[in-house]
Structure formats: structure tokens, C-alpha cells
């Protein structure tokens, strides 16, 4: 097997369901130390974080990834054990193949090959890994970024290995991500018998106009390559289960994916004002997952576009779509951030997989990116 295929299989065999690293970072740190990297383990609580650097000074280029995976679900639903890597007809199957142990293995192999070829390269090449990307994302890169801010650690460029490609490796370059803000709304009413509505206060009826206004509102018309901001109601719960009882409380969960027109405080204030206009008796609990980030035209974006175009024979699509990634914690440090990784068609699914030929091409892709930036 190739170096990247062998290492990917070793990582898949470690059942690192978030936030358990299951020894992945110990394995990777040993490889990086042997290649001449200085490795710092930044564990917090149950979360493992690894910061490995080679070289010194600016510019600082970070390869950002995660060693944790989502739970596999019922084992019997898989064609083969999710933590026993298996190749069938040129495709590697296993939990984490695409998201994102394949990219992590490719990072390490590319880093090894790069420093062997360019031991006295310009600036600093760093690898940052966490076991808390798929979970709460509190003690992982968010924590490390806070440490970096306190230390004054500079980061110029960040390449995240999230599975960004859609049909073939390199066909999409992620140049930003929307912010994510979640809320739990509780509307208080007065429980009562449905035959005596005058003695009760129905929170569903009271909240319905406000929810209709929230869901129908057009927040903006988009920003650069970002789509318009979107609010989606994800859960609604009220009632006792009986059809003759007016509920005493309504609970609503919603999420907003927003572009750089907004930040979390502005959205929170806007939504609170809207709810107040409807005279509701309510509480609102917010959870800020991360602000949006966007990498405008510059050295990193232009370099990545050129490298991907050489690989696929045409210019890649440049997008800000998808969910959130840990790059949202690195961007506020002043870094230009992009995401380049394998095809995302099977991520978080049963029988997650990656094509072997595309996995084996990934280290070369990353190495060319690093060489264009640090040589």
C-alpha cells in the first residue's frame, strides 16, 4: 500500500468517536517528530489537540484537521465493520475515510515529504489537529485559538482538509463559511381545558404570528459568494399529548446560517426585538457556534486555485457553502483560510468511503500547495 493509504487505514482502525482521539494523535506526533517537527500536546478535559511545527518565523502556514469522527450508527447497517478499513473495487470504506482521516493522513505524508525535500524552507509549516470537531467544539480548536491569541501566535494561511470536493477531488475550493447561531425559545402560556379557552392562554396561538414572521423574513440578499442568510425552525414541542388540554408552554428550536452582513449580537438583538413586538412572555437561550469568515482574493486563494486547476484541468468552483468548520476559529486570528479535501458525498453516512486513487493523489496536492507558499 502507499504511505497515505497505509496511514489512513491505521487511523480508521482507531475508533475515535468524538471526543475520544483513540491514540490517533500519538501515532501522528511520532511520525511528525521523526520528520523533524516540534510537537506540543494541548489536551483540555477529554479533548486532545496537537500543534506540530517545522521551521521558524513568518509566513506561518497551518494544515488544520480533526482526528475525531461521528458515531457509526448500527454496525449491522454497514457492509463491513466501520472501524475495519476495507478496499472494494478501488474504494476504501470506513468511518472517517472522507471526514477526515484521509485528509489528516495526507497532511502528514505531505509534511514529511515537503520537509525532506526542503529542510530549510521559508517560514513555518504547522499541523494543528483536534479530537473535538464533530462534537461540542469547545475544548478543541476554539480553545487552541484562544491560547494562540493570548500568546500572540501569528497565522498567515490555513488550509483545512474538510471534504470540500463534490464529484471529483479538487473540483471545489472553499473560500469561506457562513456563521451559525442557534436558539431555544420557550413561550409561556396558561394550561387549561380546550372547552374553556377564556381561562387559559395558548402559547402556540400566541407564538404563531411571530414564528411566521421569522420564517418568512428575508434577512439580506447575500454577500459576495455567500447565499442569503437563512433561519430554519428545526423543532417545535408543546402539549401533554392529550387533545383536550391547552398547553402551558411552547418550546421552539431554530438555527440561523448567516453571511458577513451580520454578526451574532446583531441577529440576537433583531430577533429579540421582533419577539417583543408580539407581546410574548418568553425566554430565549442562544448558542453561538461561530461567526462567518471569508477569504478574499489574495496569495492563498490564488495559489490554491492554480494548484487545483492543474490537478483537474479546469478552474475549480469557489464556494462558501456547507456547514461550519474549525477554520471559523482560526480566521479571527487574521489568517486567510481555505478548505481543500476529498469528495463529501458519503460523509456521516453508513459505508462512508473515498476512492483510493483520489486519496493517493491528495498528499501531492497538499505538498504542491505548501511548496508554492513556503519555497
Curated annotation (Swiss-Prot):
Cofactor: Zn(2+); Co(2+)
Quaternary structure (record): Homodimer.
Similarity comment text for this entry: Belongs to the peptidase M20A family. DapE subfamily.
Entry keyword annotation includes Amino-acid biosynthesis: yes
Annotated keywords: Amino-acid biosynthesis, Cobalt, Diaminopimelate biosynthesis, Hydrolase, Lysine biosynthesis, Metal-binding, Zinc
Positions of Zn(2+) 1 binding: 66, 99, 162
One protein family per Pfam: M20_dimer
Protein name as it appears in the record: Succinyl-diaminopimelate desuccinylase
Gene Ontology biological-process annotations: diaminopimelate biosynthetic process; L-arginine biosynthetic process; lysine biosynthetic process via diaminopimelate
Organism: Stenotrophomonas maltophilia (strain R551-3)
InterPro entries assigned: ArgE/DapE_CS, Bact_exopeptidase_dim_dom, DapE_proteobac, Peptidase_M20, Peptidase_M20_dimer, Peptidase_M20A
Cofactor binding: number and manner: Binds 2 Zn(2+) or Co(2+) ions per subunit.
GO MF term list: acetylornithine deacetylase activity; cobalt ion binding; succinyl-diaminopimelate desuccinylase activity; zinc ion binding
Catalytic residue list: 68, 133 (proton acceptor)
E.C. designation(s): 3.5.1.18
Function: Catalyzes the hydrolysis of N-succinyl-L,L-diaminopimelic acid (SDAP), forming succinate and LL-2,6-diaminopimelate (DAP), an intermediate involved in the bacterial biosynthesis of lysine and meso-diaminopimelic acid, an essential component of bacterial cell walls.
Amino acid at each position: 500500500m502507499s504511505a497515505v493509504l497505509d496511514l489512513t487505514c491505521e487511523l480508521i482502525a482507531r475508533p475515535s468517536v468524538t471526543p475520544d482521539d483513540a491514540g490517533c494523535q500519538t501515532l501522528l506526533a511520532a511520525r511528525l517528530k521523526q520528520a523533524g517537527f516540534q510537537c506540543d500536546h494541548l489536551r483540555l478535559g477529554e479533548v486532545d489537540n496537537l500543534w506540530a511545527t517545522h521551521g521558524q518565523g513568518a509566513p506561518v502556514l497551518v494544515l488544520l484537521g480533526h482526528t475525531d469522527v461521528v458515531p457509526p450508527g448500527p454496525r449491522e447497517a454497514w457492509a463491513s465493520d466501520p472501524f475495519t478499513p476495507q478496499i472494494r473495487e478501488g474504494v476504501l470504506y470506513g468511518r472517517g475515510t472522507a471526514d477526515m482521516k484521509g485528509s489528516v493522513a495526507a497532511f502528514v505524508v505531505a509534511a514529511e515529504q515537503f520537509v525532506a525535500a526542503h529542510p530549510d524552507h521559508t517560514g513555518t509549516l504547522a499541523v494543528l489537529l483536534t479530537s473535538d470537531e464533530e462534537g461540542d467544539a469547545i475544548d478543541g480548536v476554539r480553545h487552541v485559538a484562544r491560547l494562540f491569541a493570548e500568546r500572540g501566535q501569528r497565522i498567515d494561511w490555513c488550509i483545512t482538509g474538510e471534504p470540500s470536493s463534490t464529484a471529483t477531488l479538487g473540483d471545489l475550493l472553499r473560500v469561506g463559511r457562513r456563521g451559525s447561531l442557534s436558539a431555544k425559545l420557550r413561550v409561556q402560556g396558561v394550561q387549561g381545558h380546550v372547552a374553556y379557552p377564556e381561562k387559559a392562554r395558548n402559547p402556540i396561538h400566541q407564538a404563531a404570528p411571530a414564528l411566521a414572521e421569522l420564517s418568512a423574513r428575508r434577512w439580506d440578499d447575500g454577500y459576495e459568494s455567500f447565499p442569503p442568510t437563512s433561519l430554519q425552525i428545526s423543532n417545535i414541542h408543546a402539549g401533554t399529548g392529550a387533545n383536550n388540554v391547552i398547553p402551558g408552554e411552547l418550546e421552539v428550536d431554530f438555527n440561523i446560517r448567516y453571511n458577513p452582513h451580520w454578526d451574532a449580537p446583531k441577529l440576537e438583538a433583531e430577533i429579540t426585538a421582533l419577539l417583543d413586538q408580539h407581546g410574548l412572555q418568553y425566554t430565549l437561550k442562544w448558542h453561538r457556534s461561530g461567526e462567518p469568515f471569508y477569504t478574499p482574493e489574495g496569495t492563498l486563494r490564488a495559489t490554491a486555485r492554480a494548484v487545483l486547476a492543474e490537478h483537474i484541468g479546469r478552474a475549480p468552483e469557489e464556494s462558501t457553502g456547507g456547514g461550519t468548520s474549525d477554520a471559523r476559529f482560526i480566521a479571527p486570528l487574521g489568517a486567510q483560510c481555505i478548505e481543500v479535501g476529498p469528495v463529501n458525498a458519503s460523509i456521516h453516512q453508513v459505508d462512508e468511503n473515498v476512492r483510493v486513487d483520489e486519496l493517493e493523489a491528495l498528499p501531492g496536492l497538499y505538498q504542491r500547495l505548501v511548496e508554492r507558499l513556503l519555497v
